Regions:
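Dinucleotide-binding/catalytic capping subdomain of oxidoreductase cores
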Residues: 1-5, 15-16, 56-57, 106, ...
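Conserved beta-strand-loop-beta-strand element in the redox core of flavoprotein oxidoreductases
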Residues: 4-23, 29
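Conserved active-site and cofactor/substrate-binding residues in soluble primary-metabolism enzymes
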Residues: 5-8, 24, 33-36, 40, ...
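FAD-site-proximal beta/loop scaffold in flavoenzymes
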Residues: 28-80, 103-106, 112
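Glycine-rich phosphate/pyrophosphate-binding beta-alpha loops
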Residues: 72-79, 162-170
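Mid-to-C-terminal Rossmann-like scaffold of FAD/NAD(P)H-dependent oxidoreductases
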Residues: 81-84, 88-156, 164, 186-188, ...
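Short cysteine clusters
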Residues: 138-140, 168, 173
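Alpha-helical interaction/regulatory segments in DNA maintenance proteins
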Residues: 170-183
Length: 211
């Protein structure tokens, strides 16, 4: 998909094909530009991150002692792989390493699918050239691509354009910035998600805090 076109609503899309660019009339368009694991909690706990995923050993243990990770945060591989990783992490956490090892072969089989998934969703280089100067880069704050492209880093972009300062706190545009400009992703800070003041106030009166 090269461009979505319309007034008030989507009317047609422009596609790049081996025979050239064509236009197709349509009412809806769904695009997928890769899958990005959510590693914020791991980052906050000081776990090592590599290739946008929490690194783990054979027993799903992270770089932090007594912290195990499984599933999406260690890299996308499908629900079956996530379930097996969770079982291995659970057994390892309670010291049942022998039972954990019995699942290693099953995990390896599902990892073959994960490798194919990664290959299928790996972004092609030409996608980095799709954005135009007027392309909306940060939808929360209506910041265009040209304004962000002039900055030298993620922090610089936030300070001068308000990119990533909206409701999602950069959960979408920060990853795009890392991909397009090779910027380092921002460090996670609590709260990880937008939180109501009412919820924060309730924490101080929680029964758990009163014990």
């Amino acid at each position: 998909v090269v461009e979505a076109i319309g007034q008030e609503r989507l009317e047609r899309v422009r596609l790049q094909t081996p025979k050239g660019i064509i236009e197709i009339e349509c009412d809806r368009l769904a695009c997928g530009f890769g899958l990005v694991p959510n590693t914020q909690l791991g980052q906050l706990m000081g776990c090592q991150i590599k290739d946008n995923a929490i690194t783990v050993d054979d027993y799903q243990c992270t770089s932090q002692p007594q912290v195990w990770a499984a599933g999406e945060c260690t890299g996308f591989g499908g629900s079956e792989l996530a379930m097996v990783e969770g079982s291995i992490a659970g057994y390892a956490a309670i010291g049942q390493n022998e039972k954990a090892r019995q699942l290693f072969a099953q995990r390896q089989r599902y990892r073959l699918f994960a490798h194919l998934l990664e290959k299928s969703f790996n972004l092609r280089a030409e996608l980095k050239t799709l954005a135009r100067p007027e392309t909306i880069f940060c939808r929360c704050e209506d910041v265009t691509f040209d304004k962000v492209a002039k900055r030298s880093s993620w922090i610089d972009a936030k300070l001068h354009t308000r990119c990533g300062m909206g409701a999602c706190q950069g959960s979408t545009c920060a990853t795009a910035a890392a991909c397009l400009f090779d910027w380092q992703l921002p460090n996670s800070r609590p709260p990880l998600l937008p939180t109501r003041v009412k919820s924060l106030m309730a924490m101080s009166t929680s029964p758990l805090n009163q014990k």
